[in-house]
């Protein structure tokens, strides 16, 4: 699926940067929370992640409807395959990360509140109110595995995406990066 026109419109550019920068911020906060056990950040991480899902779905629909822009310059077949793989990985990851986070939290009994609005209830343990009882431990674990592995794969995909953009701009000297800034 390739666009005939190489230019990108304001909707494409806006969704790209809004989703991309928000996602990078969520990944940074997620890593920080995991490394430092900063539990106070979890509600913010969950809230922004759930709202991001509301942007990701239209972005994916828009991208699939519009197609991917044609490659600039003369990329090798291997480079074209790598670029397309990274593009699809980023689209899939921006959908799977919020969904798996919601799945992990909701099925794990932790609930989900988006900026205080309860979407999925918590399931506190009556014997210990500081603990929760999973609604479905298996689905919570599946969400946890997808979220953890997906986060690592998304870091790789983002690094490859940024490296490709910089290569196009500084080595190939084509318009790939410029077209993501100006409609």
Give the role of each language-model region.
Residues 1-183:
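Membrane-embedded alpha-helical bundles that constitute the cytochrome b-like, heme-associated redox core
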């Amino acid at each position: 699926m390739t666009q005939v026109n190489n230019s990108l419109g304001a909707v494409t550019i806006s969704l790209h940067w809004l989703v991309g920068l928000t996602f990078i911020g969520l990944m940074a906060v997620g890593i920080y929370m995991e490394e430092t056990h900063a539990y106070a950040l979890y509600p913010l991480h969950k809230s922004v992640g759930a709202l991001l899902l509301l942007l990701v779905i239209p972005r994916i629909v828009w991208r699939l409807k519009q197609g991917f822009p044609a490659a600039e310059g003369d990329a090798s077949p291997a480079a074209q395959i790598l670029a397309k793989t990274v593009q699809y990985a980023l689209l899939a990851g921006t959908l799977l990360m919020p969904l798996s986070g919601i799945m992990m939290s909701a099925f794990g009994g932790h609930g989900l509140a988006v900026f205080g609005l309860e979407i999925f209830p918590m399931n506190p343990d009556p014997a210990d109110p500081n603990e929760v009882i999973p609604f479905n431990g298996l689905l919570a674990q599946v969400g946890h595995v997808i979220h953890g592995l997906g986060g690592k794969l998304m870091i790789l995909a983002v690094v490859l995406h940024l490296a490709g953009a910089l290569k196009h701009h500084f080595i190939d000297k084509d318009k790939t990066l410029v077209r993501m800034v100006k409609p």
